Amino acid sequence: MHIYILGSAAGGGCPQWNCNCPNCHGVRTGTINAKVRTQSSIAISENGVDWILLNASPDIRQQLFDFKAAQPARKLRDTGITNVILMDSQLDHTTGLLTLREGCPMNVWCTEMVYQDLTTGFPVFNMLKHWNGGLQYHQVDPKQAFIIDGFENLEFLPLIIQSAAPPYSPHRHDPHEGDNIALIIKDHKTQKQLFYAPGLGKIDDQIMQIMQDSDCVMIDGTLWTDDEMQQTGVGKKTGREMGHLYISGEGGSLSYLNQLSTPKKVLIHINNTNPILNEDSAQFAELKANGVEVAFDGMQIEL
């Protein structure tokens, strides 16, 4: 399984266009040791030619320009991407579908709850309906594994997770199964497994066992502390209120990751306020000392 990190940041990226928090200002001016990061999305492949997008970020055009393998150039108009799997209906995971309209018809895999959001609150399926065949909806049963044509060695097993529907969703405060999923991706050729959960509000015993059984875990690294948005002055909500589990301290994701013998542990979907983006920070050093990696744009993993 080939895994390519297209974007590693949370909504807004880093630097965010209108933000002057220490990280955004530091990246913009080159005064801190941190990388430019776009909004989170990854691509996976079993052969290195045909790819599946996991989420479609608003930054997808630049991400695909930087990702040369996505353009095999076999004909005048071409792409290695024919399928998109959506983990949720958040704007920073779905607005990239508009940019992909030139590639329609495009297969989009998502749960019924996500499809409802994307035909009502943000009706991207409706908007692109008449664009060269539009977005082709494939329903994901959040409790059943599925395989995508052309990727027969890859099996996708959804996992219902605790998080939150986006603010525009009619059921933002009325959660349903399928609002958010994680994915267990098994490569039956290499017998390797990836656990991908860029939006994760809680880690329970089931998730711990899944992570322990995986060869790589790539999970939500949005915030270092639960009150980070408040402490930096850029927001009023806690991480838990937004559906994101913080990293540090008791009950944080690092305390769970440290219990695993999983070979590769990666944090993704990192907010621009998070001190781990600064590679000279104590927080980055703490992760490194514990064998946890911070995802970056262009990062590649082979399983």
Swiss-Prot record:
It comes from the Bacteria. Coiled coil: none annotated. It holds the Pfam family Lactamase_B_2. Pathway: Cofactor biosynthesis; pyrroloquinoline quinone biosynthesis. Keywords: PQQ biosynthesis, Transport. One of its GO terms (biological process) is pyrroloquinoline quinone biosynthetic process. Belongs to the PqqB family. May be involved in the transport of PQQ or its precursor to the periplasm. PANTHER family: COENZYME PQQ SYNTHESIS PROTEIN B (PTHR42663:SF7), HYDROLASE C777.06C-RELATED-RELATED (PTHR42663). NCBIfam families: PQQ_syn_pqqB. This is Coenzyme PQQ synthesis protein B. It comes from Acinetobacter baumannii (strain SDF).
